[in-house]
């Protein structure tokens, strides 16, 4: 008499039927799905005996459920990467390890044009001016805190403007009486000589180099007839009755004693000491 060939679970005869042998036991397909089948970690349904199964590190999937966690590309017949419990295709795994753009927060992968500044990175087209929103890319820019400005917007928003030409001072420049100038704009009003770092004289908001001030502006000493410049020797001036003298030229017409800061007598457009004036 032949041995019974029945399902281990439901005892239905298996003769002439499809069955599965598991752990030395025979079972019909229905009981296999109910009692023996692995559960797909993706869809949570049993992986039936006639379905294709993918197995990786004690986890099981239907072959159609085994996809990249990012792009959902099927991976049953392709290489893949396991990262932090997620199954990824090679392309998405590379992106996961790539730095993120500060602008769009997307991955910057090999071959992407990018801009890096102080450890932060952007796609080239994501690196834009905080004011006009135009792409700065690899062009010149000015950082201000967390913001970045193109040259034009920085000049408009932050740069000092020259009091003469009213254009932005982007580098260098000088300050005189709390007013900013381009070095090339701060010049002698007569000869256009640059005055930065040079001696000059201001007269009614006009600026003169030493030579032009001497020749065209300075008063002439009533004694020596030379210009009174205020530079070097003779910087002290004596003024009286609309006339001016170098302090060293202000002396008695007769005895030549210097009268700067002393009593004197002015007679017939001439200067005398008191003693000589008595003898006139």
Curated annotation (Swiss-Prot):
In terms of Pfam families, this protein maps to:
LIM, LIM_FHL2-3_N
The UniProt entry, under InterPro entries, shows: Fhl1, LIM_FHL1/2/3/5_N, Znf_LIM
Which parts of this protein are zinc fingers (C4-type)?
7-31
Domain LIM zinc-binding, first and last residues per copy: 40-92, 101-153, 162-212, 221-276
Q: Name one GO cellular component term.
A: cytoplasm
Location(s) in or outside the cell: Cytoplasm
Residues the record lists as N-acetylserine modifications: 2
Q: Which SMART domains match?
A: LIM
Provide the GO biological process annotations.
Answer: cell differentiation; muscle organ development; negative regulation of cell growth; negative regulation of G1/S transition of mitotic cell cycle; negative regulation of G2/M transition of mitotic cell cycle; positive regulation of potassium ion transport; regulation of membrane depolarization
Crosslinked positions (Glycyl lysine isopeptide (Lys-Gly) (interchain with G-Cter in SUMO2)): 86
The UniProt keyword set, sorted, is: Acetylation, Cytoplasm, Developmental protein, Differentiation, Isopeptide bond, LIM domain, Metal-binding, Repeat, Ubl conjugation, Zinc, Zinc-finger
Give all N6-acetyllysine modified positions: 4
One GO term in the molecular function aspect is: transmembrane transporter binding
Main function: May have an involvement in muscle development or hypertrophy. Isoform 2 binds to RBP-J and plays a negative regulatory role in the RBP-J-mediated transcription in mammalian systems.
Q: What is this protein called?
A: Four and a half LIM domains protein 1
Mind giving the lineage of the organism this protein is from? Answer: Eukaryota, Metazoa, Chordata, Craniata, Vertebrata
